[in-house]
Swiss-Prot record:
This is Tol-Pal system protein TolB. Belongs to the TolB family. Keywords: Cell cycle, Cell division, Periplasm, Signal. It comes from Sodalis glossinidius (strain morsitans). It is found in: Periplasm. The keyword Cell division applies. Part of the Tol-Pal system, which plays a role in outer membrane invagination during cell division and is important for maintaining outer membrane integrity. TolB occupies a key intermediary position in the Tol-Pal system because it communicates directly with both membrane-embedded components, Pal in the outer membrane and TolA in the inner membrane. HAMAP family: TolB (MF_00671). One of its GO terms (cellular component) is periplasmic space. The Tol-Pal system is composed of five core proteins: the inner membrane proteins TolA, TolQ and TolR, the periplasmic protein TolB and the outer membrane protein Pal. They form a network linking the inner and outer membranes and the peptidoglycan layer. One of its GO terms (biological process) is cell division. Residues 1-21 form the signal peptide.
Amino acid sequence: MKQAFRVALGFFLLWASVLHAEVRIEITQGVDTARPIGVVPFKWAGPGAAPEDIGGIVAADLRNSGKFNPLDTSRLPQQPATASEVTPPAWTALGIDAVVVGQVQPSAAGSYVVSYQLVDTSGNPGSILAQNQFKVARKWLRYAAHTASDETFEKLTGIKGAFRTRIAYVVQTNGGQYRYELRVADYDGFNQTPVHRSPQPLMSPAWSPDGSKLAYVTFESGRSALVIQTLDSGAIRQVASFPQHNGAPAFSPDGSKLAFVLSKTGNMNLYVMDLGSGQVRQVTEGRSNNTEPSWFPDSQTLAYTSDQGGRPQVYKTNINGGTPQRLSWEGSQNQNADVSPDGKFLVMVSTNNGAQHIAKLDLATNAVQVLTDTFLDETPSVAPNGTMVIYSATQGLGSVLQLVSTDGRFKARLPATDGQVKNPAWSPYL
């Protein structure tokens, strides 16, 4: 089956920027208990070496989700390139009922044709569950691989894949005029591009729901200010620069509002701006500090951190009024929550017995699962399909990005090569 290869506009425009040193995934905990799957190296039908390891990218994507455990290439019973070449009994003997095969061939004008098939090996002969073909320029080969991963993942799980998404984060370099950079990369750290450079700190990037803008905190004026930057043009608009603290921006899921934190009255409190009119209204008040807002899917409710009970804990409140409800109860303190896109759970920074880790709170049962075992974990951000979390952690004298599946089975590190990496934010679907 052939279909036109659709690319996201933001991806194309960001590719025009100069690439920096990549952030690459290093696996720190595998997924031996996840569903086994076969991903065969894609056959290269051209001269010399293949321009990209498409099969390797697909296998890595599926592994990163925590839901699949691709068979090591050294254990593959055969290396078919098409569904007709798959021998189902050879795979089922290894406990594998699904196999991804494919090939890459050169085409006109420096482009390539990438094709794949997802084969069900539970019957003999096997049946094709999904297939597709893409004609792309070389720089889009990884995107083609992520598309195959997304389609495979959705077919096998019923969950939309999130491998074509991106992450935004702040890098603090060790020297130079612009020590702080806001960057955007593919979810797996490839295709890293700068969005904004500054001699002063940059903090708290947040994606708009259509993926076209980033809100973040800058100190370039000498004090904190909230800005929104349009990614395709680079245009920056200041939206808040009140006395004292301006921070923690968060777009509502419907794109109509921006929540943020101000301390213009003394304590930190939540505010919401209507992005159409520019009108700002205060949501929380009192003597406590209220910060780190995260929206529920209804675009009317916020999860946030408050010390109203003495120590920081996660609460929720309706932006139109009402009594706040405490959500977190386990651990000495919990903060920095990010609500899942379906509103069924949140991830947060949970501190207990001196250890600071990322935990998942089921909002229906109140069950808490600690997902990480790294050091001084911060700023978790959930993938748009709710299967993965990216966060920052301390390593040595610096900070790096870490990836963990929301079931805790897969963990990986995205080590930076040129500075400390903080404040990750996962994009919506693009």
